[in-house]
Amino acid sequence: AAYHSLDIEWGNHDILWMGAFFGNAALICNLLRINCLYRNLQVIETYGINLRPLMSFALEEYADDDCENFVISDLYGIESELERNAVLRKMTKAVTVLQLKLENELIRNHPEFGMDDHILLRDDTLTEKEKWLVNHLIGEFSTNDRLRKHVNFLLKKGSMYKVFNG
């Protein structure tokens, strides 16, 4: 389909998706954290992205933690069963911890950002399991053909602030 008079102004979520497709692990974790937090995993599943390794990791890593500080939003007024919420809380915690560790690495690698005060974890070295999981997630996002088509469309028809129809 041709879209001759279409342009898109990118928002934060568009940029998250683009960064995730291009393999930025911190953005992948941020995107997953938001989608877990708001019970919106069907969007991820629509792309065919395999989240089973994340779920397995979260259930194993936080088996004895109810993750009560990771409250799942009932954005759509659908009160799902408590067991599913418990799994989502664990997944949310897992991707949050991964996101913070990965962001710390970015901050340390770029002191010119002046963001040292944003380093929130002292122990931020990825474990072997976390490294495997991050690499799996990067592969799921960066090799996804459907996501590639959507990102290419956003890149071709969009920009950060220049919008012109004509």
Kindly give the residue locations of the regions a language model identified:
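Feature recognizes metal-dependent phosphohydrolase scaffolds
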Residues: 1-166
